[in-house]
Amino acid sequence: MSHLLPFPRRRLALACLLASISGASFGQTQCDVAQLQQSPDLATAISSADYACYSGWFSASSDTLNNIYSEASLSRVQVALHQAVQTYQGEAEQARAIENLGEYVRAAYYVRYNAGNVAAFSDLLGQQFAHTINAFLANPHALDQGREQVGAMKSLTLMVDNIKQLPLTMDAMMLALQQFNPETAKNTQWVDGLNNLFRSMAGHIANDAFYRYLASNTQHIDMLEKFANDNAWALDTDADFLVFNALRETGRLIASPDKATKQKAVQVMQRVMARYPLGSEHDKLWLAAVEMLSYFAPEALNGLDLPQAKRDLAARVLPNRHECQGPAIIRSQDLTPEQAAKACDVLAAKEADFHQVANTGMQPVADDHNQRVEVAVFANNDSYVDYSAFLFGNTTDNGGQYLEGNPADEHNTARFVAYRYANGEELSILNLEHEYTHYLDARFNQYGSFSDNLAHGYVVWWLEGFAEYMHYKQGYQAAIELIAQGKMSLSQVFATSYSHDTNRIYRWGYLAVRFMLENHPQEVEGLLALSRSGQFEQWAQQVQTLGQQYDGEFARWLDGLEVTPENPDTDPDTPTEPSDGVTQLQANQSITLSGKAYSEKLFYVDVPANTTHFSVAIEGDGDADLYMSYNQVAHYYDFEVSKFVDGSNEEIQFAADASGYVKPGRYYLSVTGRGRYQAVNLTATIDTAAPTPPTQEQDDLAPVMLQSGQAQHLTVHQQRYAAVYVPEGVSEVRIWLSDLTSSDSQGNVNLYASREHWPTPEQHQFASRYAGSNQYLAIPVEQAGYLHFSLNAPQQGDDVEMVVYFH
C-alpha cells in the first residue's frame, strides 16, 4: 500500500506498508553514524541528510545509545523537530528536514529496542515527541499531498508506535481521518500515513495506558465504525486497507480488560458480520470480525458453524486441485492444469536435489506420517492475507508458511500456504522451493514436531538457512551483499533464534549452511544424524563446539565469496562493455532522434537497486522500433524484448519481481528505423525508492490455544497471547515458560494470567516476572473455564517454550 497509483483499482500487496520514495539525493551530506558522532551540530546534519543515510541509522550499534542516540541527544533533536514543525509552511525542503528528523528519532527507538537490557527512553521524552506530532497534525500543511510532504506526515505518524504515546495523539490522528475522501484516496502513500493510526493501535495491544484512555473515550469506537460505514466506497479502491484496518483494529479492542470497551467492540464486530456476510463481495470484513471474536470473545460466536464456513470458503477460493506424482497435492485459486503440472515438476526436481544434498537415503524419520503435503496457492498476496489465516491458521505478514502439524498423527495434514506474485503464464509462486524444503527437511531430517526441533536452540540457522540454500544455491546475491555491512561470526549465526531480524535468520543462516555444506560436509552428516534421531540437546552442544572451532575459517571464507548465477549463459553476471557505438542514456532525460530507414542507434541505461519502476519509450514521427536486452547489446536482429508496432510510439515496461523492485543492472536498447523517422523522443523512466528502514518485528497476536502437557514454541517480540480451557475436576494449573535461546540471551519475557479477562502488565491476577524468560506460575482453580495468559517483553523479546499441566 505504499505505491502511488491512480484509479481504476489495481490491488496492492498488504505487505507493502512503508513508503516508496524518491532516491534522488537531497543534499551531499556527511550523515553516516561515525560522521554524525563527530558533527558539531547534530540536528543540522540530520536535517540535511539524504535518503541513503536511513539504513545506517537503523543498523547502528547499541554503542550509539551513549552518544548520538542518548536521551540528551534525542532531547536536542526533539527541540529542533518542534521548531521545524512550528515554521512548516508546506515547502518541500522543510518537509524533507522534518522527515529526516522523524526517521532519525524512529531509528534511535529501534536501536534501543534491539539493544537488550538497556534502559528505555523516558516517558517524558516520549510525551514531548507526542506533543510535537500533535503540533504537526494541527499545521494546515500537515496533510499536503506532495511527495516530500507525505514523507514528513508518514514519518511523524509512524513515530507514535515507536514512542508508545497513542493516548496523547489519538484525538489528532482521528481528526486527520476526516480528510479521507475519493480524491485524497487516490494517493495511497498519503492514505498509508493515515493508516499509521491503526498500526499504532495494533502496537498498543496490552498497553494499560491505552486501555485506560479508551475506557474514558469509547466514542472513538463509535467514530471508527462510522468512518468505515461512511467510506464503504473505498472498498472498491486501492485505499480499501484503511477501512479494513479501521474495523480490524476496533475488533482487537475486545482484548481490553475494560468491560465497556470490550462490549462495544464486540457489538461493532457483530454488526460487521451482518453487513458483510460470508460470500458477499467484501466478505474479508466478515472474516476479520470472526477472527477477532474467535480470538478474544469466542462466546460471541455461539451458533456459528465455523468448520462448515471454512469448507464453503475453501471450495470457493481454492477450487482447483491437482495431485502430483510425488507427495504434493496442489490446491489453487487460479493455476491452470498446465501450471499446476509445472509446479509438480519444480517440486519433483527440488525433491531429487534435496535427497542428494542432504544424503537422506530417501528414508523418513521415525514416527513421521506426513506422506503427503498440501500446497495451497492463492492468486495474490491480497487473497493470501484475506483468506489464509481463517482457513489454515497461519500468519500472513510473510511470503508463505509451512504448517507441519503433528507428524506422529496419522490423520494429520501437512500443508504449506503460498501465493503468486504475478498472474501471467509463469508460475510466479513466492517461496515455492523454500517452503517445500521445509516439508522435506521436517520429514527426512528432523524428528518430532517443530517445538521438539526448537527445544534446545541452535537450530534456526539450519531450518531457514537450509531452505534458502536449496532455493538459491550459490546465487543468493542479497545474502552476499549483506557481508559488506558487517560480518557475523559463525558462533553468532548458530545462536540465531526466531526473535532475531530477518537478515540474521534467513541470509546469515544461508551463509552458515552453505559454508558447512561446502567446507565441512562430514560435520553436517553428523548433525543430521542427531536431528534424525531426536537428539536436539546434543545437536545444540555440537553446534556450539563447531561454531568456536570454525569462526576464523568462516570469516576468511566470507572474504572470497561471490555470486554464481545458476544460468550464466542466459543471465550474464557482467554486462557487455559498451563500445564506441553504444551511448549511455541518462534516466529521466529525453533525447531527440532522427534516422533513415534501416539505420540503428544503440544505447544503454543503468538501473540501480531499489528501482520500483523502469520503462523505456519512444514517441514521434515516422516509423522507428525499440528493442531491448539485459546485460548484452541489443540489436533489431538479436534482442530479448520488443513491442514494435507501426509508427514510432512504443513503450517497454519492466515489471518488479517478488521483492517489489526491478532487477538492477545494465539494460541495452536499439532504436532501429523500419522507415525514415524524425523528431522521435527517447526516454528511460526510472523511479527508485529509499531502502526501506527496518521496523520492529511484528508479533502474531492470535492467542495460542494450549493443551495440558503439550509444549508450544512462541516467539515473543513484544506481546503474545495464550489460553487454556480448564475442565471440571482440576484444582491447580501449573505453567512453565522456558527460554529457548542461547545461554547469553538478553531477552526478558514476563508471564501474566487472569481468569475473567486478557491480562496486561497492570491488570492481572497472577504474574511471574523473574529476570530473563524462565517463568513459573501455579494457579488454583475452583471451576471450569478459560485461563488467559499474556507474554510481555518489556524490552528485548525471546523464543520461549510454554507448557501447562493440570493437577
Swiss-Prot record:
Signal peptide limits: 1-27
Region described as Disordered: spans on this chain: 562-585
Subcellular location: Secreted
Chief localization: secreted
EC number: 3.4.24.3
BP terms from Gene Ontology: collagen catabolic process; proteolysis
GO molecular function, one term: zinc ion binding
Residues the record lists as binding Zn(2+): H434, H438
Catalytic residues of the enzyme: E435
Role: Possesses gelatinolytic activity.
Name this polypeptide is given: Microbial collagenase
Protein species of origin: Vibrio vulnificus (strain CMCP6)
